[in-house]
Protein backbone atom coordinates (compact mmCIF):
# COMPACT_ATOMS: atom_id res chain seq x y z
CA UNK A 1 0.00 0.00 0.00
CA UNK A 2 1.50 3.33 -1.06
CA UNK A 3 0.73 6.47 0.95
CA UNK A 4 1.80 10.10 0.54
CA UNK A 5 5.10 11.69 1.52
CA UNK A 6 4.70 15.36 2.41
CA UNK A 7 7.58 17.79 1.82
CA UNK A 8 6.38 21.26 2.94
CA UNK A 9 9.92 22.65 2.65
CA UNK A 10 13.14 21.58 0.94
CA UNK A 11 14.77 18.85 3.01
CA UNK A 12 11.66 18.13 5.07
CA UNK A 13 9.85 14.78 4.99
CA UNK A 14 6.63 13.95 6.83
CA UNK A 15 3.89 11.34 6.76
CA UNK A 16 0.56 11.01 8.52
CA UNK A 17 0.59 8.21 11.14
CA UNK A 18 -3.06 7.53 10.42
CA UNK A 19 -2.08 6.51 6.87
CA UNK A 20 0.19 3.79 8.26
CA UNK A 21 -2.56 2.40 10.45
CA UNK A 22 -5.17 2.39 7.72
CA UNK A 23 -2.70 0.65 5.39
CA UNK A 24 -1.96 -1.96 8.07
CA UNK A 25 -5.66 -2.61 8.71
CA UNK A 26 -6.46 -2.93 5.00
CA UNK A 27 -3.48 -5.23 4.40
CA UNK A 28 -4.20 -7.52 7.35
CA UNK A 29 -7.86 -7.88 6.38
CA UNK A 30 -6.92 -8.52 2.74
CA UNK A 31 -4.35 -11.18 3.67
CA UNK A 32 -6.79 -13.00 5.96
CA UNK A 33 -9.54 -12.88 3.33
CA UNK A 34 -7.41 -14.01 0.39
CA UNK A 35 -5.52 -16.70 2.32
CA UNK A 36 -8.58 -18.22 3.95
CA UNK A 37 -6.67 -18.55 7.23
CA UNK A 38 -8.95 -18.83 10.26
CA UNK A 39 -8.35 -15.91 12.60
CA UNK A 40 -8.10 -18.34 15.52
CA UNK A 41 -5.02 -19.85 13.88
CA UNK A 42 -3.16 -16.53 14.03
CA UNK A 43 -1.62 -17.04 17.46
CA UNK A 44 0.70 -14.04 17.46
CA UNK A 45 2.13 -11.31 15.26
CA UNK A 46 5.19 -9.08 15.28
CA UNK A 47 5.34 -5.57 13.91
CA UNK A 48 8.07 -4.07 11.74
CA UNK A 49 8.38 -0.79 9.89
CA UNK A 50 10.45 2.25 9.03
CA UNK A 51 12.65 3.49 11.86
CA UNK A 52 13.38 6.86 13.51
CA UNK A 53 10.13 8.70 12.73
CA UNK A 54 8.70 10.89 15.50
CA UNK A 55 5.04 10.34 16.41
CA UNK A 56 3.71 12.68 19.12
CA UNK A 57 0.42 11.98 20.90
CA UNK A 58 -1.60 14.03 23.36
CA UNK A 59 -3.10 12.76 26.61
CA UNK A 60 -6.05 11.24 24.76
CA UNK A 61 -3.78 9.42 22.31
CA UNK A 62 -4.47 11.75 19.40
CA UNK A 63 -1.74 12.57 16.87
CA UNK A 64 -0.48 16.12 17.46
CA UNK A 65 1.30 16.72 14.14
CA UNK A 66 2.45 14.78 11.05
CA UNK A 67 5.36 12.47 11.77
CA UNK A 68 8.81 13.80 10.94
CA UNK A 69 10.28 10.68 9.33
CA UNK A 70 13.74 9.18 9.00
CA UNK A 71 14.87 10.98 5.83
CA UNK A 72 13.99 14.49 7.07
CA UNK A 73 17.03 16.78 7.18
CA UNK A 74 15.83 19.86 9.10
CA UNK A 75 17.55 19.15 12.43
CA UNK A 76 21.23 20.01 11.88
CA UNK A 77 21.10 22.75 14.54
CA UNK A 78 19.56 20.33 17.03
CA UNK A 79 22.34 17.81 16.35
CA UNK A 80 24.87 20.53 17.18
CA UNK A 81 22.87 21.31 20.33
CA UNK A 82 22.99 17.66 21.43
CA UNK A 83 26.76 17.46 20.91
CA UNK A 84 27.26 20.73 22.78
CA UNK A 85 25.22 19.61 25.81
CA UNK A 86 26.15 15.93 25.98
CA UNK A 87 29.50 15.83 24.21
CA UNK A 88 30.02 13.81 21.06
CA UNK A 89 32.20 11.15 22.65
CA UNK A 90 29.86 10.65 25.60
CA UNK A 91 26.86 10.47 23.28
CA UNK A 92 28.55 7.72 21.26
CA UNK A 93 29.44 5.82 24.44
CA UNK A 94 25.77 5.84 25.52
CA UNK A 95 23.82 5.57 22.26
CA UNK A 96 26.57 4.02 20.09
CA UNK A 97 26.07 6.78 17.51
CA UNK A 98 26.75 10.51 17.04
CA UNK A 99 23.83 12.92 16.73
CA UNK A 100 22.26 12.55 13.28
CA UNK A 101 19.41 14.36 11.56
CA UNK A 102 17.73 11.05 10.79
CA UNK A 103 17.40 9.97 14.42
CA UNK A 104 14.36 10.68 16.60
CA UNK A 105 16.05 12.70 19.33
CA UNK A 106 17.00 15.63 17.12
CA UNK A 107 13.46 15.69 15.70
CA UNK A 108 12.01 15.87 19.20
CA UNK A 109 14.27 18.79 20.08
CA UNK A 110 13.30 20.53 16.83
CA UNK A 111 9.64 20.39 17.82
CA UNK A 112 10.51 21.69 21.29
CA UNK A 113 12.51 24.54 19.75
CA UNK A 114 10.15 25.47 16.91
CA UNK A 115 6.68 24.24 17.93
CA UNK A 116 6.62 24.66 21.73
CA UNK A 117 2.82 24.59 21.80
CA UNK A 118 2.87 21.09 20.26
CA UNK A 119 5.62 19.89 22.60
CA UNK A 120 3.69 21.16 25.63
CA UNK A 121 0.69 18.99 24.69
CA UNK A 122 2.77 15.85 24.07
CA UNK A 123 2.31 12.96 26.50
CA UNK A 124 3.58 10.03 24.43
CA UNK A 125 6.36 9.59 21.87
CA UNK A 126 6.21 6.59 19.56
CA UNK A 127 8.02 5.25 16.52
CA UNK A 128 6.07 4.53 13.32
CA UNK A 129 5.55 0.81 13.86
CA UNK A 130 4.79 1.39 17.53
CA UNK A 131 2.02 3.82 16.64
CA UNK A 132 0.47 1.00 14.62
CA UNK A 133 0.97 -1.25 17.67
CA UNK A 134 -0.78 1.31 19.87
CA UNK A 135 -3.73 1.49 17.49
CA UNK A 136 -3.96 -2.31 17.32
CA UNK A 137 -3.54 -3.00 21.04
CA UNK A 138 -3.90 0.20 23.05
CA UNK A 139 -0.42 -0.36 24.50
CA UNK A 140 2.45 2.13 24.51
CA UNK A 141 5.40 -0.15 23.81
CA UNK A 142 8.56 -0.41 21.75
CA UNK A 143 11.47 -2.83 21.47
CA UNK A 144 15.24 -2.53 21.61
CA UNK A 145 16.16 -2.65 17.91
CA UNK A 146 13.88 0.23 16.89
CA UNK A 147 14.43 2.15 20.14
CA UNK A 148 18.18 2.14 19.41
CA UNK A 149 17.48 4.49 16.50
CA UNK A 150 15.74 7.03 18.72
CA UNK A 151 19.12 8.03 20.23
CA UNK A 152 17.69 8.00 23.75
CA UNK A 153 18.48 4.35 24.46
CA UNK A 154 21.50 3.16 26.41
CA UNK A 155 22.47 0.71 23.68
CA UNK A 156 25.05 -1.29 25.69
CA UNK A 157 22.51 -1.85 28.50
CA UNK A 158 19.32 -2.04 26.35
CA UNK A 159 17.30 0.50 28.37
CA UNK A 160 16.44 4.22 28.27
CA UNK A 161 19.36 6.40 29.31
CA UNK A 162 18.28 8.36 32.38
CA UNK A 163 21.55 10.29 32.24
CA UNK A 164 21.00 11.45 28.67
CA UNK A 165 17.35 12.32 29.24
CA UNK A 166 18.26 14.37 32.31
CA UNK A 167 20.99 16.24 30.46
CA UNK A 168 18.56 17.18 27.69
CA UNK A 169 15.61 17.85 30.03
CA UNK A 170 13.35 15.23 28.45
CA UNK A 171 10.62 13.70 30.62
CA UNK A 172 11.15 9.90 30.59
CA UNK A 173 7.40 9.37 31.01
CA UNK A 174 7.02 10.39 27.36
CA UNK A 175 8.76 7.20 26.28
CA UNK A 176 7.15 3.79 25.87
CA UNK A 177 8.15 0.67 27.79
CA UNK A 178 11.05 -1.13 26.09
CA UNK A 179 10.83 -4.86 25.38
CA UNK A 180 13.08 -7.38 23.68
CA UNK A 181 11.87 -8.11 20.16
CA UNK A 182 10.47 -11.54 21.01
CA UNK A 183 8.57 -10.47 24.14
CA UNK A 184 4.79 -10.12 24.20
CA UNK A 185 3.69 -6.49 24.49
CA UNK A 186 -0.09 -6.95 24.36
CA UNK A 187 -2.96 -8.40 22.33
CA UNK A 188 -5.34 -7.21 19.63
CA UNK A 189 -8.05 -4.91 20.98
CA UNK A 190 -11.75 -5.47 20.33
CA UNK A 191 -11.92 -2.45 18.02
CA UNK A 192 -8.87 -3.55 16.02
CA UNK A 193 -10.18 -7.11 15.82
CA UNK A 194 -13.39 -5.87 14.21
CA UNK A 195 -11.46 -3.78 11.68
CA UNK A 196 -8.78 -6.32 10.76
CA UNK A 197 -10.56 -9.63 11.13
CA UNK A 198 -7.99 -10.82 13.68
CA UNK A 199 -8.94 -12.45 16.97
CA UNK A 200 -8.74 -10.56 20.25
CA UNK A 201 -6.69 -13.53 21.46
CA UNK A 202 -3.91 -12.79 18.96
CA UNK A 203 -0.78 -11.78 20.87
CA UNK A 204 1.46 -8.98 19.65
CA UNK A 205 5.21 -9.23 20.24
CA UNK A 206 7.84 -6.51 20.10
CA UNK A 207 8.87 -7.09 16.50
CA UNK A 208 11.79 -5.08 15.14
CA UNK A 209 12.90 -2.17 13.01
CA UNK A 210 12.84 -2.83 9.28
CA UNK A 211 16.40 -4.07 8.78
CA UNK A 212 16.58 -5.86 12.13
CA UNK A 213 13.47 -7.80 11.11
CA UNK A 214 14.95 -8.50 7.67
CA UNK A 215 18.03 -9.92 9.39
CA UNK A 216 15.92 -12.48 11.23
CA UNK A 217 14.09 -13.38 8.03
CA UNK A 218 17.32 -13.88 6.07
CA UNK A 219 19.07 -15.83 8.83
CA UNK A 220 21.58 -13.11 9.76
CA UNK A 221 21.38 -13.98 13.45
CA UNK A 222 24.92 -15.05 14.33
CA UNK A 223 28.49 -13.79 14.01
CA UNK A 224 29.96 -13.86 10.52
CA UNK A 225 26.68 -13.24 8.74
CA UNK A 226 25.70 -10.05 6.89
CA UNK A 227 23.40 -8.80 4.15
CA UNK A 228 22.81 -5.80 1.91
CA UNK A 229 19.44 -4.22 1.10
CA UNK A 230 18.42 -1.63 -1.46
CA UNK A 231 15.06 -0.28 -0.36
CA UNK A 232 14.10 3.33 0.22
CA UNK A 233 17.57 3.55 1.76
CA UNK A 234 20.60 1.33 1.16
CA UNK A 235 22.06 -0.73 4.02
CA UNK A 236 24.99 -3.06 4.71
CA UNK A 237 24.11 -4.97 7.90
CA UNK A 238 26.22 -7.33 10.05
CA UNK A 239 25.31 -9.28 13.21
CA UNK A 240 27.57 -9.35 16.27
CA UNK A 241 27.23 -11.24 19.55
CA UNK A 242 29.60 -8.77 21.21
CA UNK A 243 28.94 -5.05 21.50
CA UNK A 244 31.03 -3.20 18.91
CA UNK A 245 30.95 0.61 18.92
CA UNK A 246 32.95 2.70 16.47
CA UNK A 247 34.39 5.51 18.67
CA UNK A 248 34.37 7.80 15.64
CA UNK A 249 30.71 7.10 14.92
CA UNK A 250 31.22 6.13 11.29
CA UNK A 251 28.81 3.17 11.37
CA UNK A 252 25.61 2.61 13.34
CA UNK A 253 25.47 0.14 16.22
CA UNK A 254 21.99 -0.92 17.37
CA UNK A 255 20.53 -3.61 19.60
CA UNK A 256 19.65 -6.67 17.55
CA UNK A 257 16.28 -8.41 17.41
CA UNK A 258 18.11 -11.39 18.91
CA UNK A 259 18.25 -10.91 22.71
CA UNK A 260 21.74 -10.17 23.99
CA UNK A 261 23.13 -9.31 20.55
CA UNK A 262 23.73 -6.20 18.42
CA UNK A 263 24.20 -5.27 14.78
CA UNK A 264 26.32 -2.73 12.91
CA UNK A 265 25.17 -0.96 9.77
CA UNK A 266 26.47 1.31 7.06
CA UNK A 267 23.63 3.33 5.53
CA UNK A 268 22.94 5.61 2.59
CA UNK A 269 19.62 7.40 2.88
CA UNK A 270 18.89 7.80 -0.82
CA UNK A 271 18.61 4.51 -2.71
CA UNK A 272 15.08 3.51 -3.69
CA UNK A 273 13.83 6.92 -2.56
CA UNK A 274 16.01 8.56 -5.22
CA UNK A 275 14.63 6.19 -7.84
CA UNK A 276 11.07 7.02 -6.77
CA UNK A 277 11.83 10.75 -7.01
CA UNK A 278 13.28 10.26 -10.51
CA UNK A 279 10.25 8.20 -11.58
CA UNK A 280 7.76 10.76 -10.26
CA UNK A 281 9.55 13.76 -11.78
CA UNK A 282 10.99 12.52 -15.09
CA UNK A 283 8.97 9.46 -16.09
CA UNK A 284 5.45 10.80 -16.38
CA UNK A 285 4.85 9.24 -19.79
CA UNK A 286 6.08 5.87 -18.56
CA UNK A 287 3.84 6.10 -15.48
CA UNK A 288 0.83 6.86 -17.68
CA UNK A 289 1.66 3.95 -19.99
CA UNK A 290 2.04 1.61 -17.02
CA UNK A 291 -1.32 2.73 -15.64
CA UNK A 292 -3.00 1.97 -18.97
CA UNK A 293 -1.47 -1.52 -18.94
CA UNK A 294 -2.43 -2.09 -15.31
CA UNK A 295 1.20 -2.41 -14.26
CA UNK A 296 3.12 -0.97 -11.32
CA UNK A 297 5.53 1.70 -12.65
Q: Language model features by range: what are they?
A:
Residues 1-65, 93, 121, 176, ...:
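N-terminal glycine/serine-rich phosphate-binding loop of ATP-dependent small-molecule kinases
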Residues 3, 180, 256:
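Active-site donor-binding loop signature of nucleotide-sugar glycosyltransferases
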Residues 1-2, 70, 147, 269:
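A generic structural motif
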Residues 55-57, 80, 275:
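A short local structural element in Rossmann-fold oxidoreductases
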Residues 17, 76, 83-100, 105-142, ...:
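Active-site core segments that coordinate phosphate-bearing ligands/cofactors
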Residues 33-70, 98-104, 133-154, 177-180, ...:
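Short beta-strand-loop/turn "lid" adjacent to the catalytic site in phosphate-handling enzymes
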